[in-house]
Amino acid sequence: IGDALKEPAQSLAESAAKLNAPEGKQLANQADVLVRLVDEIQLANMLADDSWKSETELFSVQDLIDEVVPSVLPAIKRKGLQLLINNHLKAHDMRRGDRDALRRILLLLMQYAVTSTQLGKITLEVDQDESSEDRLTFRILDTGEGVSIHEMDNLHFPFINQTQNDRYGKADPLAFWLSDQLARKLGGHLNIKTRDGLGTRYSVHIKMLAADPEVEEEEERLLDDVCVMVDVTSAEIRNIVTRQL
């Protein structure tokens, strides 16, 4: 059923995108939302009936982040928000796991964070747990108004309550449930902490096997024995630049 609905929805989105009038752009955006919703409902059904299958591959976490960011950057820019990426993993860190599942999780939560944030910034942090090199934590922090208790219920029962919205649309009611279910398929879970008026922290804990040492690429030591003076006002950005150097 999902495929049968997705095809006409995609056709509608493609046709609407060809219209030059302002109404055509609005129609195209609504059609894109419909396509995404059909795809997410199909995924939700597969997760619910346990027919979803994980696909393991070797991939770079940083490359995955570089793929996700362009998908959310236009929405971040049009709202005048800042985006910070703070990846504490090694530059060429390689992992074995379901790349597409992790991509979906990050995209869903970052899109939700953008919708619920009117001023400030969105931060994505990546850490390797001290207890095990195979366990990773992805944190998405926003400076929005916070997620309500009613919205939090969607983590366990999708569509049970309304989500907040901005001038561009509503936050995805399936985002929390799908992210948590996919994280559990990856050996972890989603944790959400929020403070009214201060923002929300989404913590995704997953298991991603580290690549064998012989598989990892040798880091280029281009800056060995080079002294660099960093003059950056923002402490967060200064720490990121210093660590990368």
Say what each PLM segment does.
Residues 11, 41-56, 121:
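Helix-loop junction within the histidine kinase core
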Residues 186-193:
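Glycine-rich ATP-binding loops of the HATPase_c
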Residues 49-59, 63-64, 94-96:
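Short flexible loop/turn segments at helix-to-beta-strand junctions
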Residues 179-183:
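Detector for a conserved hydrophobic position within an alpha-helical segment of the HATPase_c
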Residues 57-59, 77, 82-93, 129, ...:
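Conserved catalytic submotifs in the C-terminal HATPase_c
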Residues 86, 149-150, 157, 164, ...:
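Disordered, acidic interdomain junction associated with two-component signaling
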